[in-house]
Curated annotation (Swiss-Prot):
Signal peptide: none annotated. It comes from Nocardioides sp. (strain ATCC BAA-499 / JS614). This is Large ribosomal subunit protein bL35. GO terms for biological process: translation. The lineage of its organism: Bacteria, Bacillati, Actinomycetota, Actinomycetes, Propionibacteriales. Gene3D superfamilies: 4.10.410.60. HAMAP family: Ribosomal_bL35 (MF_00514). One of its GO terms (cellular component) is cytosolic large ribosomal subunit. It comes from the Bacteria.
Length: 64
């Protein structure tokens, strides 16, 4: 039986830590930043852990 392919879109969006947690970038910081407050754009920086509801789906896409 052939190997399952990793979902290329998911592999670009998610990163798996050593402990198995899935990290994602925060949304909304690509464009139209001029009208967003500095406080808001600062909150959008960095990575955060994926929501529990989405973990199962993401793991399947990543082939974990």
């Amino acid at each position: 039986m052939p190997k399952n392919k990793t979902h290329s879109g998911a592999s670009k969006r998610f990163r798996v830590t050593g402990s198995g947690k899935i990290l994602r970038e925060k949304a909304g910081k690509r464009h139209n930043l001029e009208k967003k407050a500095s406080k808001v754009t600062r909150r959008m920086t960095g990575t955060t852990e994926l929501a529990k509801a989405d973990v199962k789906r993401a793991k399947k896409m990543l082939g974990l």
